[in-house]
Amino acid sequence: MKSDFLNRGKLLIGFAMILFCSGLYAENDLLEPTWVRPDTDFSAFNKFQVMPLDVSDVRLLRPPWAMDDPKDWSIDNEDLQLLQDIYRDVMKAILEADGGYPVVHVPGADVIQVEVELLSIMPYIRPGKRETSKGQSYITLGSGEVNAKIDLRNSETRELLLLLEGEKTVGQEYKEHNDTNIVANLEYMFTQFATRLRNAMDRVHGK
């Protein structure tokens, strides 16, 4: 019994460490776990149920330098749908690639449920604004910041296994502010998260 307890502890620590290890990505890009259920055996899971990205109550925040901008700052439903589509496609591609972990649509004893809710979005440039009045393009370090909450749950019981919440920068390089680079930055952000999740699961399965 003691050996089983210690083994579960190692699996829990291994999962958490690889998921939030500072060596994986830039230090300013970390999300620290808010809570992890003790004694969770993550090796019991080998599939993912990725729920749709929750944008039902996301708030659009202005950056400090745009507080006095008289123009409206808002995000439309098409942009929110784009966020959801990119998230869905990236998660499935990364988690399933090269003999990875199936992304399924129904709960199961070996299925871990992934729920991500976007709490707020702070774009660096007003949505819809692409050029200055002189036709000059904007160059920004990333596209903005998001605040998100992530739950990992037992898909059958809905028991919470891991919770994290924090801010993430959307993109890590100076690029022209245009639709192509905004999409690329979003793909990069979601790829980081999916890769961490994949690496953490590989770790507990000894891959």
Give each language-model segment a name:
Residues 27-41, 143-147, 156-163, 167-207:
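C-terminal/domain-edge helix-coil "capping" segments
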Residues 29-31, 97-159, 171-172, 176:
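Surface-exposed short loop/turn segments
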Residues 25-86, 202-207:
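A structural "domain/chain start" motif
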Residues 71-83, 101-103, 176-184:
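Second-shell loop/turn segments in exported
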Residues 2-13:
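Bacterial N-terminal signal peptides that target proteins for export
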